[in-house]
Amino acid sequence: MDLASQPTLSRFENAISIKSLKQLRDVFLDQFIASFDAAPRHLTFDLDAVDDPAHGHQQLTFWHGYYDQNQYLPLVITCADNDQFVMLSLRHGSAHAALAADDDLAYLVTRLRRAWPDVAVHFRGDCAFGVPDMYDVCERFRVFYTFGLTASAVLQRETESLLAEAIVARGV
Protein backbone atom coordinates (compact mmCIF):
# COMPACT_ATOMS: atom_id res chain seq x y z
CA MET A 1 0.00 0.00 0.00
CA ASP A 2 1.44 3.35 -1.02
CA LEU A 3 1.51 6.15 1.50
CA ALA A 4 0.23 9.58 0.59
CA SER A 5 2.83 12.02 -0.65
CA GLN A 6 3.66 15.21 1.24
CA PRO A 7 1.79 17.39 -1.30
CA THR A 8 -1.31 15.20 -0.89
CA LEU A 9 -1.11 15.42 2.89
CA SER A 10 -0.64 19.20 2.70
CA ARG A 11 -3.70 19.60 0.46
CA PHE A 12 -5.75 17.44 2.82
CA GLU A 13 -4.57 19.37 5.89
CA ASN A 14 -5.31 22.74 4.31
CA ALA A 15 -8.73 21.66 2.99
CA ILE A 16 -10.14 21.41 6.51
CA SER A 17 -12.20 24.49 7.28
CA ILE A 18 -13.90 25.89 10.37
CA LYS A 19 -17.19 24.81 8.81
CA SER A 20 -16.01 21.20 8.49
CA LEU A 21 -14.76 21.21 12.09
CA LYS A 22 -18.17 22.43 13.28
CA GLN A 23 -19.86 19.72 11.22
CA LEU A 24 -17.63 17.11 12.85
CA ARG A 25 -18.55 18.50 16.28
CA ASP A 26 -22.22 18.09 15.35
CA VAL A 27 -21.70 14.47 14.27
CA PHE A 28 -20.51 13.57 17.76
CA LEU A 29 -23.34 15.49 19.43
CA ASP A 30 -25.97 14.01 17.10
CA GLN A 31 -24.73 10.51 17.91
CA PHE A 32 -24.75 11.25 21.63
CA ILE A 33 -28.32 12.59 21.56
CA ALA A 34 -29.54 9.74 19.34
CA SER A 35 -28.10 7.16 21.75
CA PHE A 36 -30.92 7.79 24.24
CA ASP A 37 -34.24 5.96 23.95
CA ALA A 38 -35.96 8.50 26.19
CA ALA A 39 -35.16 12.01 27.34
CA PRO A 40 -32.79 11.90 30.32
CA ARG A 41 -33.77 13.89 33.38
CA HIS A 42 -30.18 14.67 34.39
CA LEU A 43 -26.78 14.51 32.68
CA THR A 44 -23.33 15.04 34.18
CA PHE A 45 -20.41 15.99 31.97
CA ASP A 46 -16.71 15.91 32.78
CA LEU A 47 -14.36 18.50 31.28
CA ASP A 48 -10.75 17.54 30.77
CA ALA A 49 -7.82 19.26 29.09
CA VAL A 50 -5.60 16.49 27.77
CA ASP A 51 -1.91 16.96 27.04
CA ASP A 52 -1.21 15.48 23.61
CA PRO A 53 2.57 15.42 22.99
CA ALA A 54 3.79 16.48 19.56
CA HIS A 55 5.99 14.21 17.52
CA GLY A 56 7.66 16.48 15.02
CA HIS A 57 6.71 20.00 14.01
CA GLN A 58 2.93 20.01 13.66
CA GLN A 59 1.18 23.35 13.31
CA LEU A 60 0.01 24.92 16.58
CA THR A 61 2.00 22.62 18.82
CA PHE A 62 3.69 24.83 21.35
CA TRP A 63 5.69 24.43 24.50
CA HIS A 64 3.58 24.08 27.64
CA GLY A 65 5.59 24.73 30.79
CA TYR A 66 3.32 22.76 33.11
CA TYR A 67 3.61 19.60 31.00
CA ASP A 68 7.24 20.31 30.02
CA GLN A 69 6.71 19.42 26.35
CA ASN A 70 5.58 20.58 22.91
CA GLN A 71 1.96 19.55 22.53
CA TYR A 72 -1.66 20.20 21.65
CA LEU A 73 -4.06 20.73 24.56
CA PRO A 74 -7.49 19.50 23.42
CA LEU A 75 -10.59 19.89 25.56
CA VAL A 76 -12.52 16.64 25.92
CA ILE A 77 -16.09 16.53 27.22
CA THR A 78 -17.47 13.15 28.25
CA CYS A 79 -20.76 12.10 29.80
CA ALA A 80 -20.22 10.68 33.28
CA ASP A 81 -23.58 8.88 33.20
CA ASN A 82 -22.72 6.56 30.31
CA ASP A 83 -19.00 7.18 29.58
CA GLN A 84 -19.77 8.48 26.10
CA PHE A 85 -17.53 10.91 24.28
CA VAL A 86 -19.52 14.10 23.61
CA MET A 87 -17.24 16.87 22.32
CA LEU A 88 -13.62 17.55 21.45
CA SER A 89 -11.97 20.92 20.79
CA LEU A 90 -8.42 20.92 19.49
CA ARG A 91 -6.46 23.81 20.99
CA HIS A 92 -2.90 25.00 20.60
CA GLY A 93 -0.29 23.58 22.92
CA SER A 94 0.22 26.61 25.13
CA ALA A 95 -3.50 27.21 25.70
CA HIS A 96 -5.00 27.57 29.14
CA ALA A 97 -7.15 24.54 29.97
CA ALA A 98 -10.32 26.66 29.98
CA LEU A 99 -9.64 28.48 26.69
CA ALA A 100 -12.99 28.74 24.83
CA ALA A 101 -14.51 26.04 27.06
CA ASP A 102 -17.30 28.47 27.91
CA ASP A 103 -18.27 28.60 24.22
CA ASP A 104 -18.25 24.79 24.03
CA LEU A 105 -20.47 24.54 27.12
CA ALA A 106 -22.91 27.11 25.75
CA TYR A 107 -23.15 25.22 22.47
CA LEU A 108 -23.56 21.86 24.21
CA VAL A 109 -26.32 23.09 26.53
CA THR A 110 -28.13 24.79 23.64
CA ARG A 111 -28.13 21.55 21.63
CA LEU A 112 -29.17 19.44 24.62
CA ARG A 113 -32.03 21.74 25.56
CA ARG A 114 -33.22 21.79 21.96
CA ALA A 115 -33.51 18.00 22.15
CA TRP A 116 -34.62 17.78 25.79
CA PRO A 117 -35.95 21.11 27.14
CA ASP A 118 -36.21 19.88 30.74
CA VAL A 119 -32.87 18.12 31.11
CA ALA A 120 -30.81 19.16 34.13
CA VAL A 121 -27.14 19.55 33.25
CA HIS A 122 -24.15 19.32 35.58
CA PHE A 123 -20.56 20.13 34.55
CA ARG A 124 -17.51 18.96 36.49
CA GLY A 125 -13.94 20.08 36.05
CA ASP A 126 -10.71 20.60 37.93
CA CYS A 127 -9.44 23.95 39.19
CA ALA A 128 -8.32 25.01 35.71
CA PHE A 129 -12.00 25.45 34.79
CA GLY A 130 -12.84 27.55 37.85
CA VAL A 131 -12.56 30.85 35.97
CA PRO A 132 -15.07 33.71 35.63
CA ASP A 133 -16.11 32.90 32.03
CA MET A 134 -17.03 29.37 33.06
CA TYR A 135 -19.04 30.51 36.08
CA ASP A 136 -20.81 33.08 33.92
CA VAL A 137 -21.89 30.61 31.23
CA CYS A 138 -23.04 28.05 33.81
CA GLU A 139 -25.13 30.67 35.60
CA ARG A 140 -26.53 32.07 32.33
CA PHE A 141 -27.66 28.61 31.19
CA ARG A 142 -28.85 27.59 34.67
CA VAL A 143 -26.70 24.47 34.91
CA PHE A 144 -25.11 22.88 37.94
CA TYR A 145 -21.34 22.95 38.13
CA THR A 146 -18.53 21.65 40.29
CA PHE A 147 -15.10 23.11 39.65
CA GLY A 148 -12.09 22.56 41.85
CA LEU A 149 -10.43 25.44 43.64
CA THR A 150 -6.70 25.94 43.89
CA ALA A 151 -5.53 26.02 47.48
CA SER A 152 -4.42 29.42 48.71
CA ALA A 153 -3.81 31.09 52.04
CA VAL A 154 -7.11 32.99 51.75
CA LEU A 155 -9.11 29.86 50.89
CA GLN A 156 -7.53 27.93 53.75
CA ARG A 157 -8.22 30.76 56.21
CA GLU A 158 -11.85 31.12 55.09
CA THR A 159 -12.58 27.37 55.22
CA GLU A 160 -10.61 26.42 58.33
CA SER A 161 -13.64 26.49 60.66
CA LEU A 162 -15.78 24.53 58.18
CA LEU A 163 -13.12 21.85 57.91
CA ALA A 164 -12.86 21.62 61.69
CA GLU A 165 -16.66 21.26 61.97
CA ALA A 166 -16.67 18.51 59.34
CA ILE A 167 -13.93 16.61 61.16
CA VAL A 168 -15.83 16.80 64.46
CA ALA A 169 -19.11 15.79 62.79
CA ARG A 170 -17.50 12.71 61.25
CA GLY A 171 -15.80 11.76 64.50
CA VAL A 172 -12.36 11.75 62.92
Say what each PLM segment does.
Residues 90-172:
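An internal, acidic/charged active-site-proximal segment
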Residues 2, 6-76:
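Active-site-proximal, Lys/Arg-enriched surface segment
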Residues 80-93:
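Gly-rich Lys/Arg/Thr-decorated short loops/hinges at beta-loop-alpha junctions or inter-strand turns
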Residues 15, 53, 81, 151-153:
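Short loop/turn segments at secondary-structure transitions that flank enzyme active sites
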Residues 48, 83, 126:
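Conserved, mostly hydrophobic/aromatic
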Residues 75-83, 108:
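Membrane-targeting and insertion segments and their boundary/processing signals
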Residues 39-42, 72, 82-84, 118-119, ...:
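Short coil/turn connectors at secondary-structure junctions
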